[in-house]
Amino acid sequence: MFFTIWFQVVQPYLNLLSNCSNPETLEAAAGAIQNLSACYWQPSIDIRAAVRKEKGLPILVELLRMEVDRVVCAVATALRNLAIDQRNKELIGEITLNN
């Protein structure tokens, strides 16, 4: 039950990250994922898995190409936190190499 709650939390942020071009909104959405995926408590573990299962990793990796430093910084920190999960770390590497 709790795991589905985290999917519902993640989806709006991923929607914003994939459909928005406003740098402030992108920075805020990436920052939210960054904060939610930090630490080792169970909800953060679930958030990291939810971002992966909702195909959010390629969205975040693509945003590293933006020319707005504060967006890139927020995205990079979110990816760092998501990479605490070993499977995410592997996928982030694969996605980056394939781009």
Placement of each model-derived feature along the sequence:
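Short, solvent-exposed loop/turn at the beta-strand->alpha-helix junction
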Residues: W41-I45, I84-D85
